[in-house]
Amino acid sequence: MNKKSFGNKLVASPYIVWSAIFIIVPLVIMFYFALTDNNGVFTLANITAIGKYKKAFGISILYAAVSTVITLLLAYPMAYFMTKLKISSQRMLFMIVMIPMWMNFLIRTYSWITILSNTGLINTFLQKIGLIDKPIKLLLTPGAVILGMVYDYIPYMILPIYSVMSKLDKSLLEAAEDLGSNSFTKFKRVIFPLTKPGVISGITMVFVPSVSTFYISQKLGGTKTMLIGDTIEY
């Protein structure tokens, strides 16, 4: 074994250990519990009973898909707008995007209760200006759950798209303009294909936690909104 090969393995060893502890081991534990009963005896009952939870699976995938699409539609133009600003302004907006991620996830989600409840900010404001006579049911609804997902996970969509978009070769955009491309054609033929890796990363980073979340659905959706994460917790 040469020194370069040994050095590469040495550098990669922390990642290998991290992957083994936080990815491989949890998967092994999950398969163990899936194939055993409460006494540790081998059984396929847990696998065959998965059909009972198809509704929870369906709702989880639907909510995650809707929230991912909404997040993408909001994050993509936001990331594009950020790249058009001065470096100092980009850094400021980057910090604004990052700050919510520094806050506790539970606090971020719980704050929406004070906004969406019958006595929350939205209903109180609408009643004071005379648009409604009684509170609108905003909390404990599917819309509240999707809103919570979008709010909590939108930074994970913005960051990879912005990272890719900020590194676009400006000469390619100029060449497209010189060849007579309008804004839509330039986006379709140049910008979007080159930023697709960031979009795919963002979709993955939003969809996966959305489909498995349970705290957002509990606090903003109530017991009537049972996602697969809630089913596993119970």
Predicted features and spans:
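N-terminal signal-anchor/first transmembrane alpha helix
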Residues: 1-29, 91
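Membrane-interfacial helix termini and adjacent extracytoplasmic/periplasmic loops
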Residues: 109-150, 184, 220-224
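Interhelical loop and adjacent transmembrane-helix boundary motif
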Residues: 3-7, 44-56, 214-234
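Transmembrane alpha-helices
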Residues: 14-23, 69, 99, 151, ...
